[in-house]
């Protein structure tokens, strides 16, 4: 049976300050939990409402799981993992950076995108949502087990970087006529505020996804969708054209 203290400690991990203090985070759902297990992340607790073969697994009822979940509907599997020790940002020809992305779902989607395209690091401003927020962990669908998020002040980092930097915004060079390659730092800002002034001042080039419906009332694309389009275009252009 689940103790009151166990329940309290897990629910506290919904808050960033407790995740930092305890250096722990919660993962929910069979796929997400299994991805972290397979990646070798240190696990402290594991709860299941079904028979799950693992030495740490504790069987609990569906009602107890509903008391633990950070979501409206509980998944049948929940685990508590250690937050991995942060390693230094490794040199890479292609970097994705996020400036003030505060929606957990958008960050989770960027993490999935990086994983899909083999980008193992994601650079985030301090104003970007915590990657171990339960909603981000869920949205990343296990990709967080393979992609490391680095939180740092973007402006001085961009200033020191030897890579060319590209900022995504409404006014910029047409993405489809830019002949870009997967080399450089590509920076995405929040939908509501765009790139911060400090970051914008360090950007070398600005790119935009042209709007084809000129009479549309749509003001912008969702930032994660924009990120998917840009990253896909970078890799598409790296393939040789078939004759």
Give the location of each predicted region.
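Short, hydrophobic beta-strand segments that form beta-sheet elements in well-ordered domains
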Residues: 25-27, 42-49, 59, 80-81, ...
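Active-site regions of enzymes building and remodeling cell-envelope glycoconjugates
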Residues: 53-66, 93, 163-165, 179-185, ...
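Active-site/ligand-binding-proximal alpha/beta "capping" segment
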Residues: 167-217
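RNA substrate-binding interface of SAM-dependent RNA methyltransferases
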Residues: 38, 88-172
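Glycine/small-residue-rich loop that forms an oxyanion/phosphate-binding "nest" at active or ligand-binding sites
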Residues: 57-82
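Structured adenosyl-cofactor binding patch, chiefly the S-adenosyl-L-methionine
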Residues: 116-117, 131-145, 200-243
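Amphipathic alpha-helical repeat scaffolds
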Residues: 29, 102-110, 219-226
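Boundary-proximal intrinsically disordered activation/regulatory segments immediately upstream
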Residues: 1-49, 128-129
